[in-house]
Amino acid sequence: MKVITFQTKSALEYLIKNGYLICENKYVDIEKVGPTYSWLINNMNKKVENKTRAKYPIWCWVKCNDSICPPKHKGKRVEGFDVKITFNVKETEIFITDFRRYSFLLSNLYIPDNKTDKDKFERLLKENKITKEELKAYVRKDKFNECRNDEKFLKVCNIIEKSFSKCITSDSNILQGCVWKIDYNQIETIEILSKDDGYVYGSLNYKRKNGKRRDWIAEYYKMLK
């Protein structure tokens, strides 16, 4: 399977020096390693054997419509996306998730199966007087100073977390993946991206001409029947 990852120049230097690339702890923003990331790592460990000392994975693109990764677009470059690496990986070596459904994890929202399921969750929030901002605060402690932790709230969060497994699927036109390690002999091409050329590489969350970013959760809701 051919996939693509975007990395920093220092990551490329590490790759060339060592003959492989892993995610060193010092490059991880610990403040952002909340319940969502912990869930991802725990589930990845169940499906992909970790033969390295790495605690955190390397992210990559698996599918974006008819391509592997998003096409370049005019806009501000994602910080740290200096190098585009195309490499081959076995299916047993990669943890694949649906990009849209994963957006629910970042906001700590329930992933519904259909419209009825969605409405049921909305009623649950209303009955328990829980706001979506409170749910997000629970997983984004880097952006919120405090969060709820009462029994009623945590019970709903537990229901939400049980739905997260729905993002572990290849049934989507936009797929992302995580690997523990990239060996140099897996690499097909390495492309140094031009600096300040006015393009966004490897991202779907850039601002559009209207100044807004795509709402992936809203898009998923529209797909429900």
What are these regions (language model features)?
Residues M1-I22:
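Short, extreme N-terminal segment that most often corresponds to the first beta-strand
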